[in-house]
Structure formats: structure tokens, C-alpha cells
């Protein structure tokens, strides 16, 4: 019968036995000092004690312990038998130091002594917390006091056992049978315990378990200091539940502040039955308060073989950040040679940190990159910088080149108050060849230019004002210098009153466009002169700079019902220019018999009527009930024609036609061209929605009907421009009475399979303008399976031709005909294949291909991938380098310690395989 838990205060925790004596008659205390008492629970819940003639008569049998277990008398190789004789102890328990870091099956064949629960017995919530290849998890059992946060010296001690006795002379109490001592969040269990009243010390033997918050230590013998919670467990195994970590030690010590010290300790994230990798150290320290551990004279062992030694290592035991070396990365390319990056992370404070990236490149020398991140109550940002004294002389003599290669940048967002927001995104590089020659770990978003922007925004109740200053620095010599916006001021909003349901809006913008043209020569990679930079090809108004002001007041009357809507809209579009043009530009215009007007304006009305209906019905397909919708839409748009050929193009382009193009107010982006329109757009969308809200399929189709030719075009695409360039203007598609048919749709076979497609067919030329189809497979219950098959075709591109300084229609060389196939597929449990193949049929070449395999277990992962790739600029349809790159990439991840090599592999896998990131996020 278990004793009801009693409460004892600090300084006198051992009254559990002293109080038993106090309950007896005074005469009973006259027995000999050697007399002992047998105490059991009475019917009332108190103690019922009586003296024993034989001290061992009614106690449960003493459990057998190994010679390494420390008895209540001394640590030795013999124990006293029931008759007082000396009996040699049988060594039945294996030492953890002999197990090579493996869990001891001698304690439990199923490792239940480590709170190990097999996968088939886990709940759905517990399965969601572990990886797909984990055979189970360490589950901490619910127990009293496990969430107690009180200090140990202020916590009472709770004791329970099946039976007890007390030696009055020695003031030692002996407990036997399912002994439990609990103080605060700490709990110690054992078969037997001796409680030394004078020393406030407890000694437990047999199946010892020490539990604390999220941690378990198992051993043969334990000593516990009952006044402060210090403890030592011999022949110990331990588990950190949340980290899915375990280990062993000759002995484990728990300090008063719950830090665990291990002698000859090990640490691993592998399952109890596995020893794939183990970290072993002479002295290992685990600090749950900080979430990190340390080890001295540490050896990393893989399958019992030592592969790495360090005199000191700092490693995580949970997800918290801490200063230390991050996993290194290795690579080798023709530009840099062998490259080694050894990042070091500085955890300076909870709200700011830094990372240093020393990068050794065999061909170029040592490069230092650094990044500082910060977060305050009103700001967040990143400061970064890099420097290299380049010892490679490949670009010696190139314009704008210096051996001192550098980069610095700042990204900051500051909320000044609830309405004011300040933003900075500024990066500067030493030369335009920086990203062509060097890799970076600083997260720069573009390798063709770097952004230099500062913005101040005010958000009112009915308006938003913004002051923006934005410049660009080219990181290539093959693009035209972009315009800077210095400054750009916008003010947009709506009126707070709505008479008769009317809505009044307004938009204003003032911007100064400026740039410094660079007409120097540039070189091929072999050092030969290629010619002048693209800025030299700019002619006429393409060389202009100046100010532009745009006003756009509007009014609309939304009329909405449950079955449809009609929204007429009226806008007034006014734009004014104050232009500058250099002498070269004026000369170009004079040669064409064209004049230059520095002050111009443009005013146009815009009338739009947008309408739609909504129908739905209940239907059934293949035995599944659906709600099918039918959503026809019609939009009439009228904008009169106005000649805009005398206006420069600062920020305007014409996007490719798609289903969304049917509903645009302007077929151009930007404000430099307002497309003339007298057209009616008709479209319809139908959706199939299941009863639970899951959209099984949707399809949209539509077309624009033109009542007038579209005469406003980009420079270089007008009939006049084509004739001037001796090009055939008959290819212009601005006089047809209808647009291409536009289709868009998606179909989900189930929640795992889907296909997305768009298609544009031109009835005027009887050809496909563009189209794509992408098939994606990734099961919700098993995201480790990924299949992507896609094809895209595009022949309607309008691009800026840097060799002519104007826009032009894409030619045969610009047509995109590409397939993209990628897959991640398990071959057998834990082994998967990863592959991608992207091929350009127009130029008959592979753009990227890689293939390899992955081994994934609960505690480590390995990837080996062979990759071939070209650097492609999708926007310009240009291959940056005709020279292909090749590489073999190795990635090894020891879960719980991080990646050992190959972290760069993550970058091209994430970019190249749709669904890869979701797979990784759900894996662990």
C-alpha cells in the first residue's frame, strides 16, 4: 500500500520518519537503539507503526543491484545477506560507458525506461511533431509538480513509498517499494531510498529516475541533496524530450540551478536503437535555461568511428540562438577555385545579432562578409558589408574595376508612430562585375542591379502620402542605365463622404527622372573589347531626363446585389512634363525632322463600366456533389486617342497579354503611355466547389472586342518607327477588331494533385501567342513526394532592344519554348531521388539539370547531387554566360548539430523544385 503524500518544509524534510515515531505511545520510545519500526498506512490515512523484532521481517525483498551501485553503507562489491553474511554482488547491469553511446536494452527491451513511445502508439498530434522517418518519440509523462516553477529551497518535499523503517540512533530512514521524492519540478524515483536526516541527503538505489522539466535521467544509484535539489546519478542515461535528444554518462550531476553535468558523457539526436552519430566529451554540460550545451575534449563519432575532434564545442539542445560557429560550406568554381566559408554567429542580445562570413577563395584570396541584424519596438533592419583584396588579375584594365572589391548596404524599416513609416533599402558595390565574379551570403535580391531607396510614408484615415528617393546601380555592363527617381512624391486617397453612394478618389504623383549615361567600352570575359556600353545606342527622346506630374481624380457609383454588380467609373488623367535633352538627343531628332518640346502636357478622360453576374447551382459529378458557379463579366472601356510620340518613356512597358489583361484600364504599365481604347471585354468564370468549401476546379475564358484601332504604341513599335528602321509594319497587331482568346484554369484531382494552365490563342494570326501548363503533385499526408511537370510557350514578347535603344517585338530568337521537370521521390524507406531538368527547345540547350539521391533518418541526412546550369535572365531572354557551370554538391546534416557541409545545396533545391520548402518544413 502506498503512503499518502505528506508535505515537509525546508530544513526538516526527513520528518517523514520522525513523525511516525511521534505518533506512538511514549513508552514505545524506551526500546533499544537498534530497534526498528514497521509503519503502514492506517484506515484514517495516518501512520500505524509497531516495533520489529527482526528488522527485515516485513520489508519487501531488496532489489538486486550491480557491483557498481552504491549501497547505503558504502560503494563496494559486496552486500549483506539476510543472515548477515557477506554476498558478492552479481554484475547484472551493463555500464553505459561500455555501450558506445547506445541506449541500454538491459534496462528495458523497448527503451521505455527512456520514455520512448513507438511510432504506432503516438497520437496524431505527437506524430506531427516528429519527422516522417522517426520510429517513435520521447514523450514526457504527466506527473504532479512537473510545471512547478518555485525555487527548490522554497519548495516542500513530497515522499511516498510502500513501506519504511527508521533507525533512531543514526537518524536514517529507509523507504522501500516505488519510492518517490518530489521537490518543486524535480522528482526522483527508485526501488529503495535511505534518507539521512542530519545531512539533508537522500540516497536511492535500483531503477533510479530523476525527472525535471523536459528532462529524464536514468541510473542505478542516485544521491540527492534535499535542501537545494542537487543530485548525482551513476551509470546514467538521459533524455531531453523536446529536443528529441539522449545520451549517457559515467555519472550525471544536477546542480541547484538545474544544469546537468556529465562525466564521460555523450549526446545524440538518434533513436535509442541507432548510433549513427554521437558527440562524446570528457565533461559535458547541458543548460536547459540557455538551451545550449558544451563539451571538452569532444569527439564526433559516426558509426563508432571518430571523424572530428575539438578541445571545446558549443552545441544547441533546443531551438534557441547562441554565439558560435555555424556549419561551414565548401564549393569549387572556375571563377573562385576551391572555396571555404566558415560563418561565425554572434548572439549579442535577444533583439540584435551579427554573423561574420570569412570566405577563403583559392584564386582570389580571403574575403570578409558581415551582417548585423537588429529589432527594436519601432524598427527592424540589417546592416551588411564585404571586402576583398582580389588577387585575381583577370579584369585588370577593365573600366570601373579595382582590386579592392567591396559591398555595403542597409535595410531598415522604422515606424515613427502609428501613421509615419520610414524605409531604407540601400546597397552599393565597388564595380559592375561584383556579382559575376563573387558569391555572397548577404542576401542581395538582384545580381543585375542594386537598389538605393529611401521612403517616408504617412497614412491618414482617407489618404496616403509618400516621399520616395530611389536610385539604381548597375551590376552588369550589358544593360541600359535605369532612371533614378529623385524624388518621387505621391498622394492618393478618397473623399470621406459618399453622396448617393458615389465614391470619389484621387491620385497624384510628382517624380524627377534622371540618370548619368555611361558610354564607355566594355569587354568580353576573355579581355577582348566588345564595344561601347548599351547607353551609347540610346537615341532621341530615349536620352531625355525631366520632371513628370500626374493627376488622376475619379468618381464611381458601385451598385451591388447578391446576384451581381454594376460599377460605372469616370476619371480624368492629366500629365505634365518638364524635360531636358542632351545635345546628342537633339541631334538625333533633327536628323528625323522632329522637334523637341521641353514643356508638354497630356489630358485624357477615361470612362469605364464594369459589371458582373453570379449564378450557382447544385450538381453532381462522378458521384460527388458540387456547387457550380457561373460568373459572367463585361467591361466597357473608353479612352480617346492622343498622340504621345513626343513624350519620353521613363517607366513604361507593355506586359504580355493574359486573362487579367481584359480588365485593365491601361494596357501599359507606368504613366508615360495611356492606351487609347474603345473596347468591350467579355469573360466568364465557372467554379466547382465541394460542400466543405474545397474548390475542385475553375476555368475562365474571355476576349476583348475593339471598336477602334489602337494607335498608341511604345517607341520603336509604331508604324512610323518601323518604316524608319526599314522594317515591315504589316506585323503590327494594333488594327485587329478582337484580341486573342484568353483562357486560364486549374483543376485539383484531389488535395494532392493539381494542374494550372493558361492559354492565349490569336484568331487573327491563327497561332498561339502564349501558354503554360504546370502539373504539381504533393500529398498532404506525405509531402515528401513531389512531382512537377511544366511547359511554357511565349511568342508575344515586347522587349527593349539595347542595341537600338528602342522597344521591338520579339523575334524567333526570343521565343520561349521550355519544359521543366522536377521530382523528389522515395525509392525505399529513407532513400529518395531528387532531380530537375529544364530545357529550352528554341535554342536546343539544357538550362539546368541536376540529379542525385538523399538519405534521411531521424537523426541525420545526406544528399549527393550532380548539377549543370546556365545563368539565364528571364526578363531579357538573355543567357548571361554561354559557358555552362558544373558541380557536384554534397550536403550532410546531423540533426541537432546542423549541416556539416553543403548548405548551399538548399538554395538551388528551393528555387528549382516547387514544393521542396513545404516538404522540408513539414519534415521536422
Swiss-Prot record:
Q: Which Gene3D superfamilies match?
A: Lipopolysaccharide (LPS) transport protein A like domain
The main place the protein resides is membrane
Cellular component GO terms, alphabetically?
Answer: cell outer membrane; transporter complex
Q: Where is this region: Disordered?
A: 58-101
Low complexity bias locations: 66-90
For the biological process aspect of GO, one term held by this record is:
lipopolysaccharide transport
In terms of InterPro entries, this protein maps to: LipoPS_assembly_LptD, LptD, LptD_C, OstA-like_N
Keyword check for Transcription regulation:
no
Keywords assigned:
Cell outer membrane, Membrane, Signal
Q: Which residues form the signal peptide?
A: 1-33
Report the domain of life of the source organism. Bacteria
The cellular location(s) given in this protein's UniProt record come to:
Cell outer membrane
The answer to keyword Membrane applying to this record is yes
Among PANTHER family, the record links this protein to: LPS-ASSEMBLY PROTEIN (PTHR30189), LPS-ASSEMBLY PROTEIN LPTD (PTHR30189:SF1)
Q: What does this protein do?
A: Together with LptE, is involved in the assembly of lipopolysaccharide (LPS) at the surface of the outer membrane.
Q: Which family does it belong to?
A: Belongs to the LptD family.
Self-association and partners: Component of the lipopolysaccharide transport and assembly complex. Interacts with LptE and LptA.
This protein is called LPS-assembly protein LptD
Q: Which organism is this entry from?
A: Pseudomonas aeruginosa (strain ATCC 15692 / DSM 22644 / CIP 104116 / JCM 14847 / LMG 12228 / 1C / PRS 101 / PAO1)
Amino acid at each position: 500500500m502506498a503512503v499518502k503524500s505528506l508535505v515537509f518544509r525546508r530544513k526538516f524534510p526527513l520528518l517523514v520518519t520522525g513523525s511516525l515515531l511521534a505518533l506512538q505511545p511514549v513508552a514505545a520510545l524506551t526500546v533499544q537503539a537498534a530497534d526498528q519500526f514497521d509503519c503502514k498506512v492506517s484506515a484514517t490515512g495516518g501512520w500505524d507503526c509497531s516495533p520489529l523484532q527482526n528488522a527485515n521481517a516485513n520489508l519487501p525483498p531488496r532489489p538486486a543491484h550491480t557491483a557498481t551501485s552504491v549501497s547505503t553503507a558504502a560503494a563496494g562489491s559486496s552486500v549483506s545477506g539476510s543472515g548477515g553474511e557477506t554476498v558478492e554482488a552479481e554484475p547484472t547491469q551493463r555500464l553505459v560507458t561500455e555501450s558506445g553511446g547506445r541506449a541500454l536494452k538491459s534496462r528495458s527491451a523497448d527503451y521505455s525506461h527512456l520514455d520512448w513511445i513507438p511510432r504506432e502508439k503516438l497520437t496524431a498530434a505527437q506524430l506531427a511533431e516528429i519527422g516522417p522517418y522517426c520510429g517513435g518519440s520521447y514523450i514526457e509523462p504527466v506527473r504532479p509538480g512537473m510545471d512547478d516553477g518555485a525555487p527548490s529551497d522554497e519548495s516542500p518535499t513530497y515522499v511516498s513509498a510502500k513501506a519504511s523503517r527508521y533507525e533512531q540512533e543514526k537518524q536514517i530512514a529507509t523507504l522501500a517499494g516505488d519510492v518517490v521524492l518530489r521537490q518543486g519540478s524535480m522528482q526522483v524515483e527508485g526501488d529503495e531510498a535511505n534518507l539521512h536526516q542530519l545531512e539533508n541527503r537522500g540516497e536511492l538505489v535500483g531503477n533510479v529516475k530523476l525527472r525535471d522539466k523536459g528532462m529524464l535521467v536514468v541510473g542505478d544509484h542516485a544521491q540527492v541533496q534535499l535542501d537545494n535539489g542537487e543530485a548525482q546519478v551513476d551509470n546514467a542515461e538521459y533524455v531531453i524530450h523536446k529536443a528529441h535528444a539522449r545520451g549517457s554518462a559515467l555519472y550525471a550531476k544536477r546542480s541547484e540551478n538545474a544544469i546537468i553535468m556529465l562525466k564521460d558523457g555523450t549526446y545524440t539526436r538518434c533513436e535509442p536503437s541507432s548510433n549513427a552519430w554521437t558527440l562524446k566529451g570528457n565533461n559535458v554540460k547541458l543548460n536547459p535555461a540557455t538551451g545550449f550545451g558544451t563539451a571538452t575534449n569532444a569527439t564526433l563519432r559516426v558509426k563508432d568511428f571518430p571523424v572530428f575532434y575539438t578541445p571545446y564545442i558549443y552545441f544547441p539542445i533546443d531551438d534557441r540562438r547562441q554565439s558560435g560557429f555555424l556549419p561551414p560550406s565548401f564549393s569549387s568554381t572556375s571563377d573562385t577555385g576551391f572555396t571555404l566559408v566558415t560563418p561565425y554567429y554572434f548572439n549579442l542580445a535577444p533583439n540584435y545579432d551579427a554573423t561574420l562570413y570569412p570566405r577563403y577563395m583559392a584564386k582570389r584570396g580571403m574575403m570578409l562578409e558581415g551582417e548585423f541584424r537588429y529589432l527594436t519596438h519601432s524598427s527592424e533592419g540589417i546592416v551588411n558589408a564585404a571586402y576583398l583584396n582580389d588577387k585575381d588579375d583577370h579584369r585588370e584594365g577593365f573600366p570601373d574595376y579595382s582590386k579592392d572589391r567591396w559591398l555595403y548596404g542597409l535595410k531598415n524599416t522604422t515606424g515613427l508612430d502609428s501613421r509615419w513609416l520610414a524605409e531604407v533599402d540601400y546597397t552599393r558595390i565597388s564595380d559592375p562585375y561584383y556579382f559575376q565574379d563573387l558569391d555572397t551570403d548577404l542576401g542581395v535580391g538582384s545580381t543585375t542591379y542594386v537598389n538605393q531607396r529611401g521612403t517616408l510614408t504617412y497614412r491618414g484615415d482617407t489618404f496616403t502620402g509618400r516621399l520616395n528617393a530611389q536610385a539604381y546601380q548597375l551590376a552588369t555592363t550589358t544593360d541600359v542605365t535605369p532612371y533614378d527617381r529623385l524624388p518621387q512624391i505621391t498622394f492618393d486617397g478618397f473623399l470621406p463622404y459618399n453622396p448617393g453612394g458615389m465614391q470619389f478618389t484621387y491620385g497624384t504623383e510628382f517624380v524627377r527622372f534622371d540618370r548619368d549615361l555611361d558610354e564607355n567600352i566594355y569587354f568580353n570575359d576573355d579581355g577582348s573589347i566588345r564595344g561601347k556600353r548599351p547607353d551609347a545606342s540610346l537615341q532621341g527622346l530615349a536620352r531625355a531626363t525631366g520632371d513628370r506630374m500626374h493627376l488622376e481624380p475619379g468618381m464611381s457609383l458601385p451598385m451591388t446585389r447578391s446576384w451581381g454588380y454594376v460599377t460605372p467609373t469616370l476619371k480624368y488623367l492629366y500629365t505634365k512634363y518638364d524635360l531636358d535633352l542632351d545635345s546628342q538627343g537633339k541631334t538625333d531628332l533633327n536628323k528625323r525632322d522632329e522637334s523637341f518640346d521641353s514643356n508638354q502636357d497630356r489630358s485624357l478622360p477615361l470612362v469605364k463600366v464594369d459589371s458582373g453576374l453570379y449564378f450557382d447551382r447544385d450538381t453532381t459529378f462522378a458521384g460527388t456533389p458540387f456547387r457550380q458557379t457561373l460568373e459572367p463579366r463585361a467591361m466597357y472601356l473608353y479612352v480617346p486617342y492622343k498622340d504621345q510620340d513626343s513624350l519620353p518613356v521613363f517607366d513604361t512597358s507593355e506586359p504580355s497579354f493574359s486573362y487579367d489583361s481584359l480588365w485593365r484600364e491601361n494596357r501599359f504599365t507606368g504613366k508615360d503611355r495611356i492606351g487609347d481604347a474603345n473596347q468591350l471585354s467579355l469573360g466568364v468564370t465557372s467554379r466547382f466547389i465541394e460542400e466543405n468549401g474545397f474548390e475542385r476546379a475553375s476555368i475562365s475564358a474571355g476576349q476583348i472586342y475593339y471598336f477602334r484601332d489602337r494607335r498608341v504604341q511604345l517607341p520603336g513599335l509604331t508604324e512610323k518607327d518601323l518604316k524608319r528602321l526599314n522594317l515591315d509594319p504589316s506585323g503590327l497587331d494594333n488594327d485587329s477588331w478582337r484580341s486573342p482568346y484568353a483562357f486560364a484554369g486549374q483543376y485539383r484531382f484531389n488535395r494532392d494533385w493539381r494542374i494550372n494552365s493558361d492559354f492565349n490563342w490569336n484568331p487573327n494570326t491563327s497561332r498561339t501567342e502564349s501558354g503554360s501548363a504546370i502539373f504539381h503533385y504533393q500529398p498532404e499526408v506525405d509531402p515528401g513526394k513531389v512531382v512537377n511537370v511544366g511547359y511554357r510557350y511565349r511568342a508575344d514578347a515586347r522587349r527593349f532592344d539595347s542595341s537600338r535603344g528602342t522597344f521591338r517585338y520579339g523575334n524567333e530568337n526570343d521565343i520561349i519554348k521550355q519544359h521543366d521537370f522536377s521530382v523528389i521521390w522515395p525509392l525505399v524507406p529513407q532513400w529518395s531521388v531528387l532531380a530537375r531538368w529544364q530545357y529550352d527547345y528554341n535554342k536546343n540547350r539544357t538550362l539546368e539539370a541536376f540529379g542525385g539521391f538523399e538519405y534521411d533518418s531521424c537523426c541525420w541526412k545526406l544528399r549527393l547531387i550532380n548539377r549543370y546550369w546556365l545563368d539565364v535572365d528571364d526578363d531579357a531572354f538573355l543567357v548571361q554566360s554561354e559557358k555552362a557551370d558544373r558541380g557536384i554538391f554534397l550536403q550532410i546534416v546531423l540533426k541537432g548539430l546542423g549541416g556539416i557541409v553543403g548548405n548551399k545545396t538548399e538554395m538551388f533545391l528551393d528555387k528549382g523544385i516547387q514544393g521542396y520548402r513545404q516538404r522540408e518544413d513539414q519534415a521536422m
